[in-house]
Structures are given as structure tokens and as C-alpha cells.
């Protein structure tokens, strides 16, 4: 009895799983950077690995206690759908939390967060 068909099936499943994992839009560059200490930034900027679905992707800035800091909507750059920004008001010295949701154009969704400090 040969195990060749089973091996081929296993390889196919692993290949499909690997391709699906790459379809998620994960951050490749963030400004401000995670755990950084900065002067009040004018915006939060995140570059993603995949193009984003503008209506479903967002950035939110909160205080460490969870209060929303910026009421402005985030936006995906029309010239570069991998780039999303959130305009910020002048921030007081404190720790802030960037919460992001990325939905790739193929529908895959990821969420994450990171902190930075304004001095």
C-alpha cells in the first residue's frame, strides 16, 4: 500500500494554507512606532502588506484607559491602497493606544494594536 496520494493531499493542503496566510494585510511600517516616545504627532500612519478595503479598514486612537482621542475618520490613500492614516489633534503627554483593523481586498480581516508615548 502506498502513501503517495496522502502525501500529495497533505502538500496541497499546506500550500493552500500558506497562500491564505499571505492574503492578510499586516502592518509593515507604523508611525509613530510601537513603544516609541515622541512629540505630539500630526497623524498615525500605517503601511500594510496588502491593499486595503477602504470602507472596512480603520485606525482608532484611544487613551490608555480606552477613551477615544481622535474623532476624525481614518482614510486609505487612494493612490496607495496599502497606506492608511488617521489625523490627530494636538496630544497631551500620555500613553496612547493605536487600534487598527485591516481588511484586504480579498476580504481577509486582521486586527491589532500598539502603544506609543507622547512626551
Can you say where each PLM-predicted feature lies in the sequence?
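Bacterial N-terminal signal peptides that target proteins for export
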Residues: 1-10
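N-terminal edge beta-strand
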Residues: 22-40
Amino acid at each position: 500500500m502506498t502513501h503517495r496520494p496522502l502525501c500529495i493531499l497533505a502538500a496541497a493542503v499546506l500550500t493552500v494554507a500558506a497562500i491564505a496566510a499571505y492574503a492578510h494585510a499586516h502592518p509593515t511600517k507604523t508611525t509613530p512606532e510601537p513603544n516609541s516616545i515622541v512629540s505630539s504627532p500630526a497623524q498615525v500612519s500605517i503601511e500594510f502588506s496588502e491593499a486595503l478595503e477602504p470602507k472596512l479598514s480603520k485606525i482608532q486612537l484611544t487613551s490608555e484607559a480606552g477613551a477615544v482621542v481622535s474623532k476624525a475618520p481614518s482614510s486609505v490613500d487612494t493612490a496607495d491602497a496599502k497606506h492608511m492614516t488617521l489625523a490627530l489633534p494636538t496630544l497631551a503627554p500620555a500613553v496612547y493606544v493605536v487600534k487598527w483593523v485591516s481588511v484586504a481586498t480579498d476580504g481577509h480581516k486582521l486586527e491589532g494594536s500598539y502603544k506609543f508615548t507622547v512626551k
